[in-house]
Amino acid sequence: MGADRRRDPAVFTIPPEAPFLDSLAAGLWRDAKEDQAALARMTVVLPTRRAARGLAEAFLRLTEGRPLLLPRTIALAEAADEGVILAGLEAPPPAVGALRRQAALARLVLAKERAAGVASADHAFRLAGELATLLDEMAREEADPARLADAAEAAHAEHWLKTIAFLEIVTSHWPRWLADNGLADPAARLVALLESRRRHWERSPPESPVIAAGSTGGIPAVGRLLATVARLPAGAVVLPGLDLDMDAAAWEAIGESHPQAGLKRLLGRLGVAREEVRPWPGAGASGAFAARARVVSRMMLPAEGMGDWRRVEREAVRAGIAGLGRIDAADQNEEALVIALAMRAALETPGRRAALVTPDRALAARVSAALARFGIRADDSAGRPLGATPPGVYLRLLVTACAERLAPVPLLALLKHPLASGGMRPGRFRAAVRLFELALLRGQRPAPGIAGLEAAYAHAARLAREHRPRGLAAAARVIEALKRSLGPLLAALEVSEAPPARLLAATLAAAEALAATDTAPGARQLWAQEAGEAAAARMAEALEALEHMGPIPPESWPGLFEALFAGVEVRLRRIGSAGEGAPHPRLFIWGVLEARLQSAELVILGGLNEGTWPAAVDPGPWMSRPMRTRFGLASPEAAIGEAAHDVALALSSAPEMLLTRARRVDGAPTVPSRWLVRLDAFLESQLGPGDHLRPPADWLGIARALDAPDCVTPEPRAEPRPPLALRPKRLSVTEVERLLRDPFEIYAKHILGLRRLPELDEPIDRSDWGTVVHAAIASALRRMRKEGWPGVATFRHWIEEQGARSLEALAAPAREAFWRPRLARIAKWVAEAEERRLAEEGPVESFAEVKGELALPGGFVLHGRADRIDRLADGTLRLIDYKTGTIPPQKEIEEAYAIQLPLEAAMAERGAFAEVGRGIASHLAYWKLGGGFKPGAKTPVKGDAAALAAAAWERFEALRARFDDPSAAYWPRPHPHRAPQFSDYLHLARVEEWGGGDD
C-alpha cells in the first residue's frame, strides 16, 4: 500500500468476522510503521460521521488511550454538507434547503392539481416530498429524465401518459426553477462534488495515502470515485465483509436481495474480479468468529448454492452459533424489557459494550424507557423526533386546538402542556385550567371559538349565582389568556385563503404568547434547551421556505404544519440535556445505517419481523419495478440486499449476539424476518429440530418475573359499614330502588360524596332524549289544565313545540334530525290517546311532573317526581310512568324489586304530592314512548294497585330498618341478576375483580 506509483487497483476486504474499524485502524497503524506523522498524512474516506468517530475510538483502543495524531477523515455520505471533499476546488451551486424545495415543489403541484380541480395544500406538500425523493433517486442513479417516456409498459401506456404529464414538474418546471434561483438539488450536488473530486484525483494524484473504507458503493458516482482511489499511487479501497469463500457458481447466482449483491455490483464498477481482492493485512479473526461467518455465509446462500449446506460439519455449525441467542417475546413491551435487561447486565463486566441495532424507532423508544427504569440513558444515534419533543408536541397541539376551534379535548391537551402558562405563574395557571375544565368544558361541547367559551361562561355564571365563584373567576382568567394569545391565530384561520408563511408566523406568535409566564417571555420558555433550539431552527427554515408556496385554505394548515416536522430528529448531546443524565458511554442504540462498521461485545438485533427488518418493498408511487429498471433506478430489492449485508456483518462479528422479535405488534400477529426463517431452516438441516439458539440467560423469564407479584391475594368484595350518623336521611324514589339493587352506589354517592364527572365532549344520549319527551308532554298537560282540551292537532302541536325548543337547546343537529320525526310520532300518539281517554272517561284532573316529599319518623325524607297523576271521577288516582327505554318486567313489580311506580303510589296515599292531594291508587301504568314504527304503547301494571303500593312501602320500610343497623353493609350488587343495567360506580366497587369477570 506504499506510494510506489502503482496503477493496478488495490482492493482489500476485512472479513465479516473481524471488527471492521479496529482492523482498519490496526492496519493503518502498521502501514504507517507506528509513525504518527505518517499516520496523520493519510486520508481516510468513510461512509458516515459516526464511522469517522468510531475510527478515532478504535485508534484509542489500539493505543490503550494514549494520544495520537489521527489521519484526516472524510464522511462520504455527508460530503456535500461538509464541503471538505472539494477543498480548494470550484464548488457547484449551493444545495436548495429541503423545506424550501418541498414548498416550491408543492406550489407547482398545487398548480397542477388546481387545473384538475383536486387541489389540497397539505396533500400537495406531502406529494412534493415524494417528488423530492424521486429527484434525489434520479440524481443519485444518474437517470436521464428524457427516458421517462420509454419506461412505460404497453399495457399501462395510457395511465403512464398521465403520470408523465404530472412528472413534467420534475423534468421541466423544476430544472428551470433551480436555474432561476442559482441552486442545485442536494443529491445532484453530491454527485457533482464526488465527480469533481474523482477528476481532480485522476489529474493530480495525491502522494500521501488515500484509503476509502467501509463503502459498498451504493451509487454510480461513489463507485467511480472508489475505482479512482483504488488506482491512486498510494490509494486503497477496503470493502466490508466480502465473501471470498463462496464458490463461483453461487457467486454468479446471487440476486439483488443477497447480502453480497451490493459488493458484487461495486466490484463490477471497480473493474476488479473477486479473486483479485486481498484480505486486509492483519484482519484475521479467531476460529470461533470465522466459524460464525461461515455459518452466516452458508445460511444466506442462494438456491443454487444450497448444496453446500450438506458439506458443513456439525461441530463447525455448533462452534459458529456459540454466543448466538434468540428470543421471541410476546409483544413489543416484553421485547423492549428483555433487551434492556440484557444491556443492563452487560455493564456488570468492566469495559463491556452493548448495542441495540434496529430500524424500528418505536422499539428503540421502548428500550430507552425500559433502561430509564434502571436509571440509565443509552447513547441513541437517532435522537428523538422533533415532533415528539416538548416544544414540538406543544406547537402541534396548539395548531390542532385552533384548527378545531378550541374544542374541549384538543384545547385541554394544549393548556395542560408544561409549556403553556398564559402569562401566569405556571402552578397558578395549571390550577386555573383545572377549574376552567370543571366549570365550562365537562359535559356538552361549548360553541366554537373564544365566543363559544364566553357564552358557556355566561351560562355557567347565570346558573351558579353565588356558587363556585372561584371556579368561574379562574375560568374567566383562562378565557382572557386564550383571547390574548390565540385570538390573532384564530382570526387568521377564519379567512378563505392565507399565505402559509403568515399562518406560521401567527402560530409562532400564539405559541410564544401562551408560553409566557408572569416573569419570563414566551420565547425564552419555548426555544430553550436542545429541543427548543432545534425547533426554533426548523421554524426559521420553514418561515423562509413557505414564502415560496402560494396561499392555502386554512383547513389545510394543520396537515401542512404537521408535515414540517416529518423526518426531523433532535440528537441529544452526549453530556446530557437539562433534567437528563448523560448517555452511558458503553450502551448504544443504533439505527441500521449508524451501526455499519461499528462493533460491541454484545450486539442485539431487535425488531426482526418481516415488514420491519427488512422493511416492506415499496417501489414508490410513480413507477412499477420493471419501469424503474427500464428508467435506470435501483430495484427496491436492492435495499433488502443492503439490509441483509448489515445483518450478515453483525451476525458474524459480535462475540455475543441476541436476536429478538415480538410475536404480536399492536395486537396483530407477526411473521419472523426472512433471515430468522433461513437461520432456523439451516440449523434444523444441520443439527435437527430443537432450540439451538438459547441465550446465555433466561431473559424472557427474568422479564416476566420482574413485575410479577410474589403472590396474588384476591381482594374481597367491598363491605362498607359507615356510622349511622353518616348514612343518608334523604333519598329519592329512584334512589330507593338503587339501594335495593346496588347499596354500594348509594354509599359512594351519598356517604363518600362521589359523583361521576361528565365526560369531555359528552355526547347527547338516551337520557337526554327521555328528558325531552317528558318535558314536552308535561308542558302540554299543564297547558291543558289551564286552557282545557284543545283538540288532537293543537295538543300535538304543543308537544312538538316544547320538544323542538328542548332539542334546539341540546345544540346537536345530527341528533335533532334523528329525534324530531320520532317526537312528531310520539306527539301524535299521545294526543290521540288523550282524545280516546276523554271520550271514555270524560275530563279528569291531570298533573304532570309532580314533585312529592314525605317526612318520616327518625328524620328521614323520601322524595320523588311522578311523571303523571290523574285523579279519576271516583277520587282514586292513576299513576303513569313514561319510558323511552325498557319497561320493568311484571314479575319484578310483583316481587317489589321494580318499586319506583308502586312506591310513588304509596307516597300519594300518604299525601306526599301536595298539588294532587291524598288519594289511593287504583291504576298503575307504563307508557312506552319509542317514536319508531310503533310510536307508543300502554302497559298497565297487573294486579291490585293499592296492594302493590303496600308491598312497595313494606319493602321500603324494611330497607330503612336494615340500613339503620350499624352492622348492615352497603354491599355492591347483592343480587347480580337484579342488579342495575348501568352504574357509574362499578369500578369503585371492583365488581369485575371479586365477581370473577375479565378486567
Spans of model-derived segments:
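Polyanion-engaging groove/track-forming segments
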Residues: 1-787, 792, 800-813, 829, ...
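RecB-family 4Fe-4S metal-dependent nuclease core
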Residues: 519, 667, 711-999
